[in-house]
């Protein structure tokens, strides 16, 4: 049922984006439409209807190209770093009756916003290189732990903390095991002699 109504729900996309006449509501409409198209594609793939999938994929491709053209035509947004620091500087410039901004605003007005926004930048755009490989995360964490604890690497483990805790135990555990083995052996001989 939905497959018959779906093509009517997705109008044809204009080929040339208007210069600056596009609104966020129109962009949201295309994003919602794209979501419906993706759901229809998935549904038709599950049903084995490849012809319908191809039609929906073509519409989705047109929508994506249109949105990309709009994004390319728009001026780049201001970077998030300078905006908060200028807002903080403007707040500090205005006199407050009896109120004083926290000292960290005065000491590092630009370092604070950069520290807040820098890690979020790659995540907002879905960078495939950052935070993708768990082994790289473990290695970075392991190196950080080694730097703090002065431990030399012996190999990859599940996580850096576990590795850092295992190495000292290995040395201690070996000594304890040897002592325990001698004691157990003596006790064992005594028990065997008693039988």
UniProtKB/Swiss-Prot annotation:
Q: Which domain of life is it from?
A: Eukaryota
The record's InterPro entries line, in alphabetical order, gives:
SS18_N (IPR007726)
Instruction: Report where it is expressed, by tissue.
Output: Predominantly expressed in shoot tips containing the shoot apical meristem (SAM) and flower buds. Also expressed in mature flowers.
**Annotated region described as Disordered, given as residue ranges:** 166-195
Q: Where is the composition biased (Basic and acidic residues)?
A: 181-195
Transmembrane ranges?
none
Biased composition of type Gly residues is found at: 171-180
Q: Which UniProt keywords apply?
A: Activator, Transcription, Transcription regulation
* Cystines in this chain: none
Q: Which family does it belong to?
A: Belongs to the SS18 family.
Per the entry, what this protein does is: Transcription coactivator that plays a role in the regulation of cell expansion in leaf and cotyledons tissues. Component of a network formed by miR396, the GRFs and their interacting factors (GIFs) acting in the regulation of meristem function, at least partially through the control of cell proliferation. GIFs are involved in the positive regulation of cell proliferation of lateral organs in a functionally redundant manner.
Self-association and partners: Interacts with GRF1.
- Descriptive protein name: GRF1-interacting factor 2
- Originating organism: Arabidopsis thaliana (Mouse-ear cress)
Q: Which gene encodes it?
A: GIF2
